[in-house]
Amino acid sequence: MGGIFGTISKKSCVADLFYGTDYNSHLGTRRGGLATYSSEKGFVRSIHNLESSYFRTKFEPTLNKFEGATSGIGVISDTDAQPLIMNSHLGRFAICTVAKIVNKDELTQLLLEKNMHFAEMSSGSTNPTELVALLIIQGKTFREGIENVFHHIKGSCTMMILTEDGIICARDSWGRTPIIIGKKEGAYAASSETTSFPNLDYETAYEVGPGEIVKIKADGMEQIRPANKKMQVCSFLWVYYGFPTSTYEGKNVEEARFTNGFNLAKTDDVEVDCCSGIPDSGTGMAMGYAAGKGVPYQRCIAKYTPTWPRSFTPSNQSMRSLVAKMKLIPNKAMLKGKRVLFCDDSIVRGTQLRDNVKVLFDQAGLKECHMRIACPPLVYGCPFINFTSSKSDMELITRRIIEKFEGDANKNLEKYATTGSPEYQKMVDEIASQLGLTSLKFNTIEQLVEAIGLPKSQVCTHCFDGSSAYTLNEFADED
């Protein structure tokens, strides 16, 4: 997915920029970047690969190069190298994005036909952030340029632009990914995650709306473009992406996860000895489930946090498998002979869960393994956010099972996505069988949306029900 952070201050911003960006590290594992501005040095940039190390480890030794900066932006990226520094008729600026551009090749060709050129490459193709920057500089103003991005791309794009006199923050026009503004005396900040704010003494001041453009300076904030009326914020922020202490649209992540588990327990008739979460994003749900069910919450599986990152996002499948195997350690003393219900955020490929379940039975002596999932089955690929490193919908376990049953992975998707239908139940039973589970239940869209606490019309549930295909165009038509 990726996360961005920016800050502007009446004094040095370097420490806040460094730590604020680091607090977005759970959103990506591939690259990190910082760009700053000072009247003495101008724009300064640094980018590092994070696949073999952490953000702080890579950037801390070189922070002195940013000395004296009073404004800056940072990014944790799962795709391209960024931020980029551009020189144009709009002036010099640095830009970072959280974006997925489905029609990237088409737009690249369009710009090449206009005699524009690309200097950056990302994994052998156009750098999406440079593509966005080139669309921006076609406008007469930053507002016009950003609206040009919204009108042209399919997918989503949230961005921060560092100029000589401030930081421009633009949220994607359907509001899928957040930007929250924080403030403290003499400084303003913007972040994908409110988690960045408390330890840096920022208070949440404002949440940028869908398609809204604001500019922050050290002494205040101004609106450049008003927010759109419609919103489709990504439900997976509360299911998986979000850090427990973060809040989006006024709805806290951990609170939603706890409520999700609590409500699911009230409708579940399984008998178990205890409940446990698959760390980290299954933990809050498991605590809620245990409270709702009236059974003990126990840490039957522990995550070795000092050195092992998330296994969801590494681009290499063998690395994902290695991380998944090494990071989770079963506690045999709490598992042997027990009936345990586990809570997890989602099932994507199913490979990690299948291997973990086998270990629980074969090595830890588990008697029964019941799995409860925070969201409905993932039936549709996400065209809006870099949800996983998957290149094909066939990496989804649901699609492989549908192909097994129907002979066509794209047939009768709506039936399989409908909770309670014969096709749905047949698919869930097959998933449970393939993964070796005693029982398996997924949450419903209705219960998930209720736990989040926003109206269904404002929450994107496309990966569960395919309902948001009409919003593929980034530009939100208010008519």
Which role does the model predict for each range below?
Residues 1-209, 215-272, 278:
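Conserved short alpha-helical segments that host acidic/polar catalytic motifs at enzyme active sites
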Residues 12, 103, 176-177, 197-198, ...:
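Flexible loop/turn segments at secondary-structure boundaries
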Residues 28, 270-281, 285, 370, ...:
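Short glycine-rich phosphate-binding loop at a beta-alpha junction
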Residues 37-41, 164-166, 277-285, 292, ...:
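A glycine-rich phosphate-binding loop feature that marks nucleotide/adenosyl-phosphate handling sites
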Residues 122-130, 297-310, 407-410, 439-452:
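A conserved beta-strand->alpha-helix junction
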Residues 165-166, 201-207, 358-479:
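PRPP-dependent phosphoribosyltransferase catalytic core
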Residues 275, 282-289, 293, 297, ...:
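Extended, hydrophobic alpha-helical segments in both membrane/secreted and soluble proteins
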Residues 294-340, 350-351, 379-391:
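Short, glycine/charge-rich flexible loops or terminal/linker lids adjacent to PRPP-binding catalytic cores
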